[in-house]
């Protein structure tokens, strides 16, 4: 009798568990789905028909069919992309993440300062920062009276208005809009000036102020080094004689002692590109106008000494 009762009890449990998975429960699940997601029929204002061309203009009916193919709307009207059709950047497929993780120089957040210093040391010498060159390139995108921020806004308005599906297709095809490319280039130039010189107001600088800076600051001016005379050349004696005559004539001229001091500087201690020479008045003016917000490394022209930070130099003493 006891075994019979146990059998009846287990049979009853099986029947109850079977009742939970019926057609009625499936209908309840579908009702929940309809409550969470909007169907095409729930969206009002949609137009039927197919796209057609009128007077060389493509006219498409106003509906959400293309959007519903790529995703769905929830009950609150928010759009969600289908995960299985999520757009991915093609270049990510070519990256060997396992190899990157095993590299010795992989980025370690705990060694942030060491990583940043290593990047500065490994930065190629040929990629020297040139302030005047950056400013001249920025002016090419700008118009008179515009600030850098206004130029970016103007270029942004000139970009074509595309649907989400059109943007995805262009991204997959590798098509880049010219105006988008100009915005990226101008932003990159402005950010480089901001990070190298500390000029936080670069996006508020006008077309005229940038032109004035270009006229005031030469691009790449290095102190000229006299060419060495090759003692094994055929014309060595002639060049040496001319050189001695020039030096003797210069020494015979009355010496006009000028106490004017000129300066040369570079943006960072590791920089190989030297700017200058500049007068003391100009260096003082730039310092008073807070042009060198983070300071630059300065030394007197003609002195083969180390560069020192401009924040510790009082240019008033040399006037």
Swiss-Prot record:
One of its GO terms (biological process) is wound healing. Residues 25-47 have a biased composition (Acidic residues). It is found in: Nucleus. InterPro entries: CD2BP2/Lin1 (IPR039905), GYF (IPR003169), GYF-like_dom_sf (IPR035445). The modification Phosphoserine is found at residues 25, 30, 41. Residues 12-24, 109-124 have a biased composition (Basic and acidic residues). Gene3D superfamilies: 3.30.1490.40. The keyword Phosphoprotein applies. Residues 260-316 form the GYF domain. The modification Phosphotyrosine is found at residue 37. GO terms for cellular component: nucleus; U5 snRNP. Keywords: Developmental protein, Nucleus, Phosphoprotein. PANTHER family: CD2 ANTIGEN CYTOPLASMIC TAIL-BINDING PROTEIN 2, PROTEIN LIN1. This is CD2 antigen cytoplasmic tail-binding protein 2 homolog. It comes from Drosophila melanogaster. The gene is holn1.
